[in-house]
């Protein structure tokens, strides 16, 4: 009779989840599953609301990445209005979205994942957390706080507040950038750039200590998907977080699908529902479920592009691409990809702020609804974010579908958990470090479970190993 190991809750992620590891009669890992245990139902209670409220309403899906939902939602509403928003509004939205990328990636890398990198996967859990980092590695801890602070301050300067700004609206943004705020933001960027470069240098110096994790943390063939935009000559694919078209690549580096407009996402993506989790499982239609596994997020975005489009980030991207002959398949390298994206974000914000029309006061297009349906797609920190709305003749929402980055990654996270569990978990004697690795592979995806169910720190943990008759064979307690 099989046995089970249950990790409940998974720590240092956003939201509530657990991991179940099934063992066979010989004590070997047979299967492992990632379960999202919270339910929120945002799609359903949006019904009946005016579509113009959707950016602010869906922004409440998450307190960590509200800007991401603002962007995708506003783009869906732009489609319903059938307007082309002013170019300055596009640039201002892009700046806020990049600031969101910076602050969220900083939270993921410095606060949630750096304890594993600094203290090791087998480190004492009593100190393997952000407070332990503050005590032993104060410079890195301060860098993380400052980088996230800068990202949040840029959001506040543009939108009026750091959490749930109401500045991104259907048709553009509600107010232009002032010369004073432009200068304030520009003055913050040199420090942010220095932190990004310093942290990248440190990470590249320690990555060889984690060769085993690189080889076993979600390292398997899959598709990758993200938005991309063309380079100026149209021959290369460039890093994109706000606009662009969808691209799919296979594990050999072959472009499977390219140039997909946002409103055609349903031609390629479908969603499966499983009984043991509130998180849906999107898959690539042509391969079916569950074979149509694909990944989104920082790793996917860097795999799918030829260049970032900014000087220092392009140098780092060249080094990143040199790590493998094709796409990088290891989810552990999501950490590396986040650092490159933060550097790109800082450089790109500086470029946009120096555009001659960035202070233009024409930042919003007004119209009544001209379509009954709209789709908005953008790149959130964790990956591709999709909002799809339908309205009635009164402009009220009748149907909503939100496919969140963590949802896109659900099949990949489950496969990653199984791979790590099979490599590290030994039923004869449970060790905290074994189980931390199972959690740590989930942290490489930086899942946002509030978002993904349309729903930190060191949390209590009890892991029990039960025998065939339910007898307690071993347990690990934390907290």
Model regions: which residues?
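Active-site bordering "gate/hinge" segments
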Residues: 1-384, 394, 404-479
